[in-house]
């Protein structure tokens, strides 16, 4: 399953998520940001590539809907509601990501069996 994690600048939250979940078997994971200053900017190619898109805040989903409406039309875009107040691999950020993403991945894996 191909997972794409998106935050604003692709420095702290989405990079943490990418590095955390790419360690798990069965997942191909990438990350990007919506801001012009993002380390890796979200683009059409990444959105088409992804099976599931996780965004950190509602604003990120809104930006995707405005800029890439056709590319995400048939995609599952999940808002994690993780605020921009954590640094890379912050213990609390890792805990929030595990608590919010793992149950969703487990459910998706059950549904695909």
Where are these regions (language model features)?
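Short, flexible active-site-adjacent loop segments at beta-strand->alpha-helix junctions, enriched
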Residues: 9, 59-60, 83-86
